[in-house]
């Protein structure tokens, strides 16, 4: 499964480390990653690939990590993301 993971919140130390450590624990490989900092607002977008077939559990674990870090983490199946953003 491939997924698009977005992270948004106030910038602070440990966001990238926390999110990527959780992805590693979930055995997800980061295919692409981009992050931006604008006026104290942190955003990161990743395409990840995992063999984890339980998408709901994958989403829930990243959501819990987001709450712990004080950021919003949104996970969407890559195929759905692409279909929604097709011109």
UniProtKB/Swiss-Prot annotation:
Pfam family for this entry, one: ACT_6
Membrane spanning stretches: none
Domain ACT: 4-76
Disulfide bonds: none
InterPro entries: ACT-like_dom_sf, ACT_dom, UPF0237/GcvR_regulator, UPF0237_ACT
PROSITE patterns: ACT (PS51671)
HAMAP family: UPF0237
Family to which the UniProt record says this protein belongs: Belongs to the UPF0237 family.
Database matches in PANTHER family: UPF0237 PROTEIN MJ1558 (PTHR34875:SF6)
Protein name from the UniProt record: UPF0237 protein YjhC
Higher taxonomy: Bacteria, Bacillati, Bacillota, Bacilli, Lactobacillales
Name of the coding gene: yjhC
């Amino acid at each position: 499964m491939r997924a698009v993971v977005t992270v948004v919140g106030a910038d602070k130390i440990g966001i990238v480390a926390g999110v990527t450590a959780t992805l590693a624990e979930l055995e997800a490989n980061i295919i692409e990653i981009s992050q931006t900092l604008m006026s104290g607002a942190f955003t990161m977008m990743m395409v990840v690939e995992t063999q984890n077939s339980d998408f709901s559990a994958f989403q829930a674990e990243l959501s819990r990590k987001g709450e712990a870090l004080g950021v919003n983490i949104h996970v969407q199946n890559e195929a759905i993301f692409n279909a929604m953003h097709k011109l």
